[in-house]
């Protein structure tokens, strides 16, 4: 019997509980979890800033996490490329994905005769630092006007 493969993707810059929630959710739906790590260049284009942690380091960190079986870097030219190579049974999307984005993904994959189940993590983890941006804001708040003691 073939292994059921799930894929999820993200920047995974500053790890927080939301990342772990998504990875654990994904692993519950498959035998093997492959994580696609957004490339530094792609993140800069989309978010207007480079990740704090370089892509190769983010890949190594994600690969070391218990639910993750394998991590790969995303494509610089075609966001579907790693998905088409992996051919997952399930794609896990984060809570910030819209219905439009989900329908667009289904449509794009169907053009390649790929029809995975697409599941969405429905809610955000409720905690003070549930996003990388919140972590960065807190670091700035605590340290921007103080001398760093190294």
From Swiss-Prot:
Pathway per the UniProt entry: Cofactor biosynthesis; FAD biosynthesis; FAD from FMN: step 1/1
Pfam families tied to this protein: CTP_transf_like
EC number: 2.7.7.2
TM region(s), chain numbering: none
Chain residues that bind ATP: 11-12, 16-19, 96, 124
Cofactor or coenzyme needed: a divalent metal cation
Catalytic reaction equation(s): FMN + ATP + H(+) = FAD + diphosphate
Enzyme class: transferase
Listed GO MF terms: ATP binding; FMN adenylyltransferase activity
Family: Belongs to the archaeal FAD synthase family.
Function: Catalyzes the transfer of the AMP portion of ATP to flavin mononucleotide (FMN) to produce flavin adenine dinucleotide (FAD) coenzyme.
Protein name (record): FAD synthase
Species of the source: Methanococcus maripaludis (strain C5 / ATCC BAA-1333)
Gene for this chain: ribL
């Amino acid at each position: 019997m073939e292994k059921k493969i799930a894929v999820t993707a993200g920047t995974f810059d500053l790890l927080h509980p939301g990342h772990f929630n998504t990875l654990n959710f994904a692993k519950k739906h498959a035998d093997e979890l492959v994580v696609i790590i957004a490339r530094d260049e792609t993140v800069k284009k989309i978010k207007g800033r480079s990740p704090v942690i370089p892509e190769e380091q983010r890949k190594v960190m994600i690969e070391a996490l218990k639910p993750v079986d394998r991590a790969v870097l995303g494509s610089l030219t075609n966001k579907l490329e790693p998905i088409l190579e992996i051919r997952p049974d399930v794609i896990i999307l984060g809570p910030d994905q819209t219905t439009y984005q989900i329908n667009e993904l289904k449509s794009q994959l169907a053009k390649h005769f790929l029809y995975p189940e697409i599941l969405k993590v429905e809610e955000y983890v409720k905690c003070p630092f549930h996003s990388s941006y919140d972590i960065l804001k807190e670091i700035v708040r605590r340290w921007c006007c103080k001398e760093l003691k190294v």
